[in-house]
Regions:
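Extended, low-polarity transmembrane helix blocks
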Residues: 1-62, 68-166, 186-197, 208-292
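Alpha-helical phosphate/pyrophosphate-handling elements in metalloenzyme active cores
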Residues: 173
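Membrane-helix boundary elements
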Residues: 176-186
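Conformational-control "hinges and anchors"
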Residues: 203
């Protein structure tokens, strides 16, 4: 995978995911999420529910348009990166609200509705890769993009060991042709423990592989982590009523679409840990063989 291919993949995943999120909010999906976000800033009473959806949808739709424009040097890299930071900071700051945590289980770090919010940590490292790559070392960009992958797998994976989360994923697992067999082998909690253990194990192994520069470990654990985020995309098609004619996808669909950001993070990690040296060597060979 070349640098250009990696850039195109990251751009495509960002563009598609934010376009879907923007359209769904614009069409009225998941209004409670918007109300909770704007309530944190005491702005929930200033706009109607439909106006909140329109405002948020347009704001999110602007990001993929600016990203594509910046790739063609029609918009400055600084402008699109700052806008991405602004768009993602708005939901991320709401993690300071106690409503994002399970109060009956002691609050932080037992995450509740914040599970969909922490995914926004994945976005800014992707824009730094696209537009500020020369400002960072390859090692820094690798860890910047690994960090959100590790965070979501360790954090949400860790929640799988709690009863509330085990019960929450039943609707996802039992309708999946790839995962429903777990309930034939394990209890609801046991299956959740297996899923959580898988997430935690391979997040740690990927970190170890990157730290030790062990390519076989990076490949094996990276593919395992990738499988987690690709598997969640199948829930779009296996969970009933995720798609609808009114808002494209529902709240669950929005939650799932965000996992495409982690696929992009993993693509960046793969490029710098597995492909960058090969790509550079190929370019140097081509230059040496070209007529002087």
């Amino acid at each position: 995978m070349t640098l250009n291919q990696t850039e195109n993949m990251v751009t495509a995943l960002l563009t598609f995911s934010f376009a879907v999120l923007g359209l769904t909010f614009l069409l009225g999906a998941n209004p409670n999420a918007l109300i909770a976000t704007f309530k944190f800033y005491s702005l929930d009473t200033m706009l109607s529910e439909s106006a909140l959806g329109a405002f948020s949808g347009i704001a999110l739709l602007l990001l993929p348009l600016m990203t594509i424009a910046a790739r063609f040097n029609l918009v400055s890299a600084k402008a699109v990166t700052l806008y991405a930071a602004f768009v993602t900071a708005i939901p991320l700051l709401t993690l300071l609200s106690p409503t994002r945590w399970m109060a009956d289980l002691g609050g932080f770090p037992i995450i509740g509705s914040g599970q969909g919010i922490i995914k926004y940590f994945a976005v800014l490292p992707l824009f730094l890769f696209l537009f500020y790559r020369e400002k960072f070392s390859h090692k820094q960009l690798t860890y910047l993009n690994f960090a959100p992958v590790a965070m979501v797998l360790l954090w949400i994976g860790g929640m799988k060991f709690f009863e509330f989360e085990a019960n929450a994923i039943v609707g996802l697992v039992e309708t999946s042709p790839f995962m429903s067999w777990l309930y034939a082998v394990f209890s609801v909690q046991g299956a959740s423990n297996v899923i959580g253990g898988f997430d935690v194990l391979f997040a740690l192994l990927l970190g170890a592989g990157i730290f030790t520069k062990n390519k076989p470990v990076i490949i094996a654990s990276g593919l395992a982590c990738l499988s987690v985020f690709l598997m969640t995309q199948t829930f779009l098609f296996t969970v009933p009523d995720t798609f609808n004619s009114t808002t494209i996808v529902n709240r669950l669909g929005q939650f799932i679409i965000k996992d495409l950001w982690f696929v992009a993070n993993l693509a960046v990690v793969a490029y710098f840990t597995l492909f960058e040296a090969v790509s550079r060597e190929r370019e140097e060979t081509q230059l040496s063989q070209s007529p002087q």
